[in-house]
């Protein structure tokens, strides 16, 4: 990719696509994005996914945010994400915990905190 495309994440955050690779063998697009969010927190996964959907004309259920790395106080995040051609391929390759994380659902772990074993 010759010129670096810009992606608007929110009013306070803008990203630059550093790497955009088409992986035809797997059926996905692999993107590295550097997001500048000076004076505000790290953008949420939902905000990132919304921006990527608009920028690449994709569907929400085909985008997976793999990793968000932010250095303390820097206001810059490095984001790795994948855009798949089909939901079937995505579900075969990506770990379930990442799909749950991007969907905003949390997996319930067994056990209880302060429930039956607590003294009263």
From Swiss-Prot:
Pfam families: Ribosomal_S24e. Residues 101-120 are annotated as: Disordered. Keywords: Ribonucleoprotein, Ribosomal protein. One of its GO terms (cellular component) is ribosome. PROSITE patterns: RIBOSOMAL_S24E (PS00529). InterPro entries: eRP_eS24_sf, Ribosomal_eS24, Ribosomal_eS24_CS, Ribosomal_uL23/eL15/eS24_sf. GO terms for molecular function: structural constituent of ribosome. The keyword Ribosomal protein applies. GO terms for biological process: translation. Belongs to the eukaryotic ribosomal protein eS24 family. This is Small ribosomal subunit protein eS24. It comes from Saccharolobus islandicus (strain L.S.2.15 / Lassen #1) (Sulfolobus islandicus).
């Amino acid at each position: 990719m010759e010129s670096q495309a810009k992606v608007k994440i929110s009013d306070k955050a803008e990203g630059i696509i550093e790497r955009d690779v088409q992986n035809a063998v797997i059926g996905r697009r692999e993107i590295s994005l550097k997001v500048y969010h000076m004076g505000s927190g790290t953008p949420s996964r939902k905000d990132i996914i919304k921006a990527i959907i608009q920028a690449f004309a994709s569907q929400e259920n085909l985008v997976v945010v793999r990793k968000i790395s932010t250095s303390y106080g820097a206001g810059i995040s490095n984001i790795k994400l994948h855009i798949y051609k089909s939901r079937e391929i995505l579900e075969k390759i990506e770990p379930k915990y990442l799909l749950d994380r991007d969907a905003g659902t949390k997996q319930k772990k067994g056990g209880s905190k302060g429930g039956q074993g607590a003294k009263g």
